[in-house]
Amino acid sequence: MPRHLHPSRKTFARFASRQPFQFGLPNVSPELAQASDNSPVYFTRTNSLLRQQVLGNAKGVAIKSDAFRFQVLPRDCWGKADFSKSSVLFLIPDDALGDCVGMTLFLRAFLQRYPHAKTAVLNSAAASDIFALIPDLAIFQLFISARNLAQFEYVIDLSEMEGWKDIATMPVNPEEALCEAFELAPVPLEKRDVSFKPGINIGIVPMASSPLRTLPPELVGKISTLFARHDANVTIVLNAYQGVMKAYKAALGDLAAPNIRIVDGFKTIGDLVQFVSKQDYMVVADSGPAHITKLFQTPGLGIYSSASAKTLQGRHQNLRSWQSGFVGPYCQAPCGLAKLRATPDGKIGCMGSLNVAASVLSELPQKSDPALARTLVTENPVPCVAELGQKSDAILSLLKTELSLDS
C-alpha cells in the first residue's frame, strides 16, 4: 500500500454477516447483483440503500461501525503516480447519471493510458450499467468485502476532484476535471453525421430530475409532431421513477400520430443505455440521457436552462446546444443551480420563480413538495424553462435547418 494516504471524505458502514446474502438494485441489470463471499467484514456507504433499509433489520448482520473511512491516495498525488501494473479501486461519489458518464469517460482515458491496470468502482449504485460498458471493470454497486478490498493497491476517492463540493449549485464536467487531475489525454471521439431519412429513429427525453431542467410539455409536443410529419419513428421517454411523470404525460396531450410512441420509462438504466445507443438522433433536456449520448456520440439537440451547455457538454460536439436566454432582475440563465432551493422560511424554488437573490436560497429543501413539482413541470415552469417554450418556433427552425426538413 502506498504511503501518504489520508481518510476518504465519506464514511462507510463496516458490517459482518453470519449468513450468506446477495443484493442488487431493482433498476440495475440483474447480472450486476452482488453476493457475499464469506469475508469477515464488508463495507458500504453509510447513506446507501443497503445500509439504511436492509442491514439494520437483517438477521445475522452486525454493524461494526458507521464511521469507517478508507485510506485513500490524496488528490495531489493522482497525476504523479504510475498505475501501469497497479490495482485501483475508485470510490464513486454518487450515482447521478451525468456525473457517472463523465467518470466512465475518464476511466476510458485511464485505461487508454494504463491498459494493464486492474480497475474497479465502488458505490456505483443505480449507474452501475453505465460503468459496465467498460470491459473488465469490476463493479461493486453497493458494497465490497474485506477479501476483495485487500486486492487493491490504491483506493482513490473521486469526490476529491475539483468542483465536486459545489456541484449542487455549479455543475462541473467530471471527465474534464479528472483527466486534468490524472494528467491524462481523453479518448478520441468518433463523429456521427446527422442524416435525416424516412424511418429514422428519434428519441426525445424531456424529463430531468429537477423542474429547473425539465422541458415544457408544449415544446416537446411541437417537436414530436414536426418529426412525425416527416415520417420519423419518434419515441418520447419519460421517467416512471419520478413522481411527476403521470402529470407530465397528461400535459403532453394526445399526440395522435401513429409514429409517435410514449414510453413511461425503462426498468433498468441498462435498458435506457441500450435505447440511446440505437437512436439516430435525440432531443434531450439537461439530464442523464443527454450525457449518455456522449458514450456513443449520438447526434442530437440538447436543450439547456439553468445549467451551462458549454460546461456540461465539454469537448463533446455530438449534441448541438440550445441555451435558455432568460434574463430577470435576480438571475439570468444559466444560473448554475441544478436543483430547487429553499429560503429560510421554507419557500421552495429558484431566484427567478421566487423573485429573491441567490444569497437567500442557501439550503436544499428539507422535504419534498410533490404538488409544487407537478405545477412547475406542467403549468407554471420557472422562468428560464418558460423561456424555452416561448422560443419554440426558433427551436423548431433550428431543427429544420440541421436536419434539412421542409416546413
Feature names for model-found ranges:
Residues 2-407:
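Catalytic machinery of carbohydrate-active enzymes
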